[in-house]
Amino acid sequence: MSCETENLDIKYLPVNPGTAVTKITFSSETPDLVSVYEPGNSGGRRRCFVTDATVATLPVMEHFISKFEDGSCGNDILIILGSGEPYKTIDSVLEIVSNAIEAGFSRKDLFVGIGGGVICDMTGFAASLFKRGIACQFVPTTLLAMVDASIGGKTGCDFKNYKNMIGEFWPAEEILIFPEFVKFLPECQYRSGLGEALKTGLLFDTELYDIFKNDSEKLLQADSETIFNVIKKCASDKAKVVEQDLTEKNIRMFLNLGHTFGHALETVAGLGSIAHGD
């Protein structure tokens, strides 16, 4: 037999990154996650809720948290992680995965991140890993997460003092935004979210920029109507970019304005010591 070289190509359909569509709901109502999710009444789709110690103690979360005795409510479970950037680690991500495994979750179930960018990023990353992919939803509780971090599918965690070094593009199937969470933020986190929103205005939206220019006093006073408008504009602007370039090969790279220097500064200062939007 003569020597031959043959090739075989395997053709793949586009891989669905968690969901084909992300539904974003904006609500001016007081957050009532018991009414939204009805813990213990999952309707056949179990939920793994993930939050942090700070969010879990908010007054608007008290009723929801109380439903989970010993971390479970019916077939649903609740995981409360440490708060802030120091806990944005692969160990925290694997803690979510481990709890879902121990509770017998399947690929048809759901992970729900309730918190700021750290919780949303880690919950989404854990969802992408669990059984090679489970759906996720987010309830962002910081302004930064509402205008940026929860939107667009970037998930991950820090690793060896490198910010967001490992992760996956895994968009949430639904994002529920309650701007009222903003009133519970410390000033530094509120300012951080405004910084991210201003960046979006500078890049893509003159109307958004004009809000910062003309309504600065209302923003500084956290006027609810003004903040609601800023959040909706940022979400819409980012959605348009992500629809064109989910995996950041082109136009989405513009959203990294300030991030190269900013991430380096955060790393040198010690992750968590400087707010991301600062």
Residue ranges of predicted features:
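ATP/NTP phosphate-donor binding region
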Residues: S2-L110
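Glycine-rich beta-strand-to-loop/alpha-helix junction loops that act as flexible
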Residues: G82-G84, I114-G116, L257-G258
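A glycine/threonine-rich phosphate-anchoring loop and its flanking beta-alpha core
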Residues: P14-G18, F125-E217
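Phosphate-handling active-site elements
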Residues: E102-K108, K131-V139, A269-D278
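Short glycine/serine/threonine-rich phosphate/pyrophosphate-binding segments
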Residues: V118-F125, M146, H263-A264
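Active-site segments that bind and position negatively charged phosphate/pyrophosphate groups
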Residues: D215-D278
